[in-house]
Amino acid sequence: MFTLPPISLYIHIPWCLKKCGYCDFYSYVSKEIIPENKYIEHLLRDFERDLSLINNRNINTIFIGGGTPSLLKNTSIKNLLNGIKKRKIISKNIEISIEANPKTLEYQNFIQYKNSGINRFSLGIQTFNSKMLKKIERTYNSKDAMNAIIESKKISDNINLDLMYGLPGQSLEEALSDLQIAIQCNPSHISWYQLTIEPNTVFYAKKIQTPHQDVVFNMLIEGDKLLKKAGYKKYEISSYSKFNYQCQHNLNYWNFGDYIGIGCGSHGKITQKNGEIIRTIKNKNINDFLSGKYINSVYQVSKRDKIFEYFMNVFRLYKPIFKKHFRENTNIEESFIEKNIQIAIQEGFLINQSDCWHTTKKGKNFLNSLLEIFLK
């Protein structure tokens, strides 16, 4: 029997202090006063509109991302969350996360965020190395980063640090030094991911070079060892947590759960009662969004795209992929992908068992090659 998956809420705040050269996320540099009150008002209207699509499900997690959400006043964040809570569709033990730039944070921010219901803080540190921070065009220094961590830990024990490796000119020793500093700070969660330079970025246009792939691979391998030794469990390709501190919002994405996306440039995935999945794409033009034109497009995901998107997410996790889970979340029988599965097994990417599939070490290391099999 087909059942609707859990559903989350993603809220996009598009403004930033500065557009970093490597960033391909949708954002605006805030050169003028941000129209906070108006934006919050339209976020709530956008939210109201999407509620008609979710079939009375409760929202299990909320993630406020960007951009730089911590640019908004604390009262704006509070008004936003209060407006959402009024609908009374929020799960009792909901995880509410906010992304934050160390440059924009003070102790008072964390207190007021917590009072608003936020119980998880994700700090975009990226690196503690001042030289590297300048290279990747971040707006803060290593002292700002440490201060943000110290202040956040006074308020919450549910702290994520975002760190990148493979930065331009970065050595193995420098990458591991970042990790060692992060581990000493003892956050509950560390996201340790490789910098990739996407085509629509300033770094791509400038032909900025990252370290050789062998050096980057060694960063990953040695970083894995450091994190494991320090008590962090790797549960996803770039995610490591202490016991019981996995990011529930991201886990919902990776388990192919549903999510509403509200805000300028956001997108959503919402499963219908008949098993079909629709995608919502919101307007990227801030002026249009603030005039009530929220939707850019809504479309139904094709059967083949549904399969690819499912595996693109679940293959990131370090756990078995149960065949029952595939059926329940795609409304497709596994016999439809039997040929694809056999090719993946022959290539050494997957192991087949009676009730599940396992990705091999080779499958994780060559994830793109594994995913290409499910495009056919």
UniProtKB/Swiss-Prot annotation:
S-adenosyl-L-methionine 1 binds at residues 10, 66, 99. Residues 1-233 form the Radical SAM core domain. Pfam families: HemN_C, Radical_SAM. One of its GO terms (molecular function) is 4 iron, 4 sulfur cluster binding. It comes from the Bacteria. The keyword Heme applies. One of its GO terms (cellular component) is cytoplasm. GO terms for biological process: porphyrin-containing compound biosynthetic process. Its cofactor is [4Fe-4S] cluster. [4Fe-4S] cluster binds at residues 16, 20, 23. Belongs to the anaerobic coproporphyrinogen-III oxidase family. HemW subfamily. NCBIfam families: hemN_rel (TIGR00539). Might carry two S-adenosyl-L-methionine binding sites with only one binding to the iron-sulfur cluster. Probably acts as a heme chaperone, transferring heme to an unknown acceptor. Binds one molecule of heme per monomer, possibly covalently. Binds 1 [4Fe-4S] cluster. The cluster is coordinated with 3 cysteines and an exchangeable S-adenosyl-L-methionine. This is Heme chaperone HemW. It comes from Buchnera aphidicola subsp. Acyrthosiphon pisum (strain APS).
